Amino acid sequence: MQRFKISSEFNPSGDQPGAIDSLVRGISCGAKEQTLLGVTGSGKTFTMASVIEQTQRPAIIIAHNKTLAAQLHEEMRSFFPENAVEYFVSYYDYYQPEAYIPQSDVYIEKDALINDKIDLLRHSATRSLLERRDVVVVASVSCIYGLGSPELYSEMTVPIALGMKLDMCQLQERLVELQYKHGNRYERGSFSVQGDVLSVFPSHYEDRIWKISFFGDEVDSIQEVDPKSGMVTLKLEKIKIFPNSHYVTPRPTLLQAISEIEKELDECALQFKQCNKIVEADRIVERTRFDIEMMRETGTCKGIENYSRYLCGKEAGDPPNTLLDYLPQDAIMFIDESHMTVPQIRAMYNGDRMRKANLINHGFRMPSALDNRPLTFAEWEDRKPTVVYVSATPGQYELQQTGGVATEQLIRPTGLLDPVCIVKGADGQIHDVMCESQATIARGYRVLITTLTKKMAENLTEYMREMGIKVAYLHSDVKTLERIEIISDLRLGVIDVLVGVNLMREGLDIPECALVGILDADKEGFLRSTTSLIQTIGRAARNVEGRVILYANVITKSMRTAMEETDRRRDIQRKYNQEHSIVPRTIQKPVQTSLSERVGSSRKKVSRDTNTDPANRDIVELQKEMLLCAENLDFERAVEIRNEIKRLTAP
């Protein structure tokens, strides 16, 4: 068995050795939950990696957004190059859920754009969890959403070894059952046959094909082939073909599920008729019968996840299978930025249920569709393994769970102090932050600026661009892989300034950043709370020149608390440096190969300014409005906007 082994030129230093020992000791003594309070730049990721190495236990790290998950994934890959470090996030670039608006009698079909590259990484994650123990999965909160049963997923795998008796026709039938497509094109999740050779492109790889040669009904050879060059890269003795969908089901189980679906359909249609809802009764019968026929013929159907209760053999109301069910029992769960991630986990269930209720009440889905859902918070609590909450500002829940005790990691290995905080008047803040940015850029550093509204961020970005500054605007509409590219461009100097509304939530790790500008810091609210301010201040804590300017006309309670906590930490850090003769130095961190580069970014290399072409500007604005409508459950308006976008982009 491959063991976890960190590859790094650094050794634990500062508060890291004590934090690592404390967490490992707690895990060894059976502590179910612990909290790591680590300031920005103190090496929390290295501490997590060290805990994994010392305990030799599989781990999942849950982050509150895809950008942070991608950064953690890259860091963990660099620490564990010989181990399986996987990435599991939602594979939707765009997602509009199925919905019904009774007021206008409008049904909206599910509309989604799946990112095939992220789907590949999801399959790689589940495969690793089932095949080995040296696995670290970095995930977003999508890991608590329904996923196929790990038992069925594992049961459906097809092992093949040299010399084994195997009928090629039967193998083709098995591959179709695993949702592989038959064809001559080399694409992931497909297979083809030429003479006595069957070529299969596994669901969990993007850069290799397996060619299986037969001599009669016997496997004669197994070769790994580069799909681009056609060259043989490896000769194998055995392989295991994993399903191309997490919802594949053995034929007997599928037929049993169909029988149960038909029973519920009869009951559902009868209830509608008894209530004199003839339209709804006809609708549910027509839609469900169509799905049943598709499942009988192909093993799947559109929206098959809505029948997951039956496919996984669950009872009504049972928790769904999720990625957590693929984890070994002794796994460690790290909740990164727990002050943000825990509330996200808590909120997932209710929104999903409210939307499905309309579909069920009007005959678009049967009640069993309610079991295709994320875990409730209580279910998540029941299923979580050993947990370590990680944050610079742990929330009330985390501290309650750990009895108010937290392992502190305030001393950075580099000796860096928390940044100096300066308060300036909000009047004239745009001009001042422009001048401060230009001075910072002239010294070779980068700048982060956070505003209160998207409109203000857009206007500031446009103004700075007109003034000749290389600037980009980071916002929620930017796709996952493009967001990672923008952050990489900032570090490389392709851009010098990054503007955003809630930059602290993006998990930005920019050692080159020497200035953070917080506009309208005195406007109390979520974006200017104590927690948010401390997190945002921390963005400048990786550079010895780091400064934070808070633009405010009054000092609010949140500002005062955040600055006092920053000063407390600075005092502790300064005393430690004096006692150990440490001279602070900027964190040295190479710009690693981004996730998008490794899986093939779909982003076109175009100017950051999407507003140069009026037509492009219209489409971008419409896309933003469409996504906002979907988030606000205004699906009718979202569909209208989607249709308008299709009209504008038609050739």
Swiss-Prot record:
Residues 427-591 form the Helicase C-terminal domain. ATP binds at G38, V39, T40, G41, S42, G43, K44, T45. CDD domains: DEXHc_UvrB, SF2_C_UvrB. The keyword Magnesium does not apply. InterPro entries: Helicase/UvrB_N (IPR006935), Helicase_ATP-bd (IPR014001), Helicase_C-like (IPR001650), P-loop_NTPase (IPR027417), UVR_dom (IPR001943), UVR_dom_sf (IPR036876), UvrB (IPR004807), UvrB_inter (IPR041471). A motif (Beta-hairpin) lies at residues 91-114. Residues 593-615 are annotated as: Disordered. It is found in: Cytoplasm. PROSITE patterns: HELICASE_ATP_BIND_1 (PS51192), HELICASE_CTER (PS51194), UVR (PS50151). Coiled coil: none annotated. Residues 25-178 form the Helicase ATP-binding domain. Residues 616-651 form the UVR domain. One of its GO terms (cellular component) is cytoplasm. SUPFAM superfamilies: C-terminal UvrC-binding domain of UvrB (SSF46600), P-loop containing nucleoside triphosphate hydrolases (SSF52540). GO terms for molecular function: ATP binding; ATP hydrolysis activity; DNA binding; excinuclease ABC activity; helicase activity. Forms a heterotetramer with UvrA during the search for lesions. Interacts with UvrC in an incision complex. Belongs to the UvrB family. The UvrABC repair system catalyzes the recognition and processing of DNA lesions. A damage recognition complex composed of 2 UvrA and 2 UvrB subunits scans DNA for abnormalities. Upon binding of the UvrA(2)B(2) complex to a putative damaged site, the DNA wraps around one UvrB monomer. DNA wrap is dependent on ATP binding by UvrB and probably causes local melting of the DNA helix, facilitating insertion of UvrB beta-hairpin between the DNA strands. Then UvrB probes one DNA strand for the presence of a lesion. The beta-hairpin motif is involved in DNA binding. This is UvrABC system protein B.
